[in-house]
Amino acid sequence: MFVMRCDFVSIFPEYFDVLDISLIGKARRNGLLDLRVHNLREYSEAGRVDSSPYGGGPGMVMSAEPWARAIEHIATGESLVVFPSPSGQPYSHDLAQSLSSEMHIVFCCGRYEGIDNRIYEWTATRLRSSGISIGDYVLNGGEIAALVILEGFVRFIPGVLGNPESLVEESYQYNLLEYPVYTKPAVWRGLEVPDILLSGNHDLIREWRYKKQLEITQKTRPDLYSTHIYETDS
């Protein structure tokens, strides 16, 4: 049975207590995921992991040596080392699907003004490594980004989702956003469920949902809409 291993290195390991809940926690208990958390300070001298930046500037920069020690201890030749970073490649549906086939991912969650750039050069000469961005904004650290990346790709691991068909109509599956969904009651505070969803005609329902996907995507993500139209016409 395929068991993916993910290691998270951080100076705030408490961030990852959430790995015991929801689908990820269930997958962990069922033996589908092997998740391990490491405190970066354990790989440093006297717990010191940062220093002032060369050239001046605000804040502190994380030293390369503790990260190198952690990576040497945790990673193997099969590992992919991921640095969550605003300067990394954008996270996407396709990238999430690709990550789900990895045997071992090591997430290096930086803080402060970032990590000494030499750690990226050093890692790239020894292991497969990648910077990944979850959006055009800056967070206080890489922990939340690492969790977002994890949430995105574990859905593709067989057995994690209760209903595998959920992936078939997933938002972004065909460069389209998700259609609106409804549940009981049929009338809520004067607002009604669209009649077509109550018709039982699955062909019409499928057509309606696709139309709504097109409308929503064109309105809020015209870039995805253009890609979908191009791929459909190709």
UniProtKB/Swiss-Prot annotation:
Q: Which keywords annotate this record?
A: Cytoplasm, Methyltransferase, S-adenosyl-L-methionine, Transferase, tRNA processing
> Which domain of life does the protein's organism represent?
Bacteria
CDD domains registered for this protein in UniProt: TrmD-like
A GO molecular-function annotation: tRNA (guanine(37)-N1)-methyltransferase activity
Q: Which family does it belong to?
A: Belongs to the RNA methyltransferase TrmD family.
Which amino acid positions bind S-adenosyl-L-methionine, per UniProt?
110, 134-139
What does the record list as GO biological process? Answer: tRNA N1-guanine methylation
Quaternary organization:
Homodimer.
Xref: Pfam families: tRNA_m1G_MT
The job of this chain, per UniProt, is described as: Specifically methylates guanosine-37 in various tRNAs.
Cellular component GO terms, alphabetical: cytosol
Organism name = Tropheryma whipplei (strain TW08/27)
- Which locations, inside or outside the cell, does it occupy? Cytoplasm
Q: What is this protein called?
A: tRNA (guanine-N(1)-)-methyltransferase
The taxonomic lineage of its organism, from the top, reads: Bacteria, Bacillati, Actinomycetota, Actinomycetes, Micrococcales
Q: What is its EC number?
A: 2.1.1.228
